[in-house]
Regions:
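Non-catalytic terminal/accessory segments
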Residues: 1-223
């Protein structure tokens, strides 16, 4: 038996081994077991060995590798390149909708949709160690679109101050200097770049969906 760590989600999984020799043997054994015992096909393109000291390994939208820090290896993770392109395109497109709302849509509803997209990205990818770097790029592209498209002959419609914010918004974004408002709209535009890495921790035993006390931490994490 060789030491290994297995991470699985649905039919996608990663196996981490200490040496290349262990990885080769594990790959052969697992492939044979899946094909012979489970009667399932294994994709040669997706089933490969990656040296995470030299290359990224992608899993569930994250890309992961290790780097040397203070004489030991630590995990470095970020949003994978394909997801960066997809999320950036969605945010930029929604920013255009804020500047020019779609038919039967208001500027407020477009801002609320954009904010929900920001929360979704931040909540999912905040476990990545380089999340702030990726989100700064998103923020830069979005603000370029909003600044250019909300600029009028009488001045910019993009303001630094606006309506009141909720307690949850204050706790999450209250310290940010990147908050912006559209003139005449009280709803703030959430700054996607105002995010930092969250260390992954095991779920507390109190958290569950069946009691009021157990649901409280879940609702708090949503904002």
């Amino acid at each position: 038996m060789k030491e290994m760590h297995i991470i699985r989600y649905a039919d996608d999984f990663r196996i981490f081994c200490r040496t290349k020799e262990d990885a080769v043997r594990t790959k052969e054994a697992v492939t044979a077991w899946i094909e012979e015992r489970l009667k399932l096909e294994v994709s040669p393109e997706k089933t490969r060995i990656v040296n995470t000291r030299k290359r990224w390994s992608e899993f569930l939208g994250f890309k992961i590798r290790v780097r040397l820090k203070h004489h030991k290896y630590v995990v470095q993770s970020a949003i994978c390149d394909k997801k960066v392109e997809i999320e950036r395109a969605k945010l930029v497109e929604q920013a255009k909708n804020i500047a020019k709302p779609r038919e039967k849509k208001s500027c407020l509803s477009e801002i609320q949709l954009y904010n929900s997209m920001v929360l979704g990205i931040q909540n999912y990818y905040q476990l990545a160690t380089c999340i702030s770097i990726d989100c700064r790029e998103f923020h830069r592209r979005v603000m370029t679109v909003l600044t250019n498209r909300l600029n009028t002959e009488t001045g910019s419609m993009l303001k630094h101050e606006g309506g009141t914010i909720t307690q949850a918004e204050k706790e999450r974004f209250g310290q940010s200097k990147m908050i912006r408002y559209v003139s005449g709209i009280d709803q703030m535009i959430y700054p996607i770049a105002f995010i930092k890495n969250k260390i992954p921790m095991a779920k507390r035993s109190i958290v569950c969906s069946y009691t009021k006390e157990g649901r409280a931490p879940i609702h708090t994490c949503l904002l």
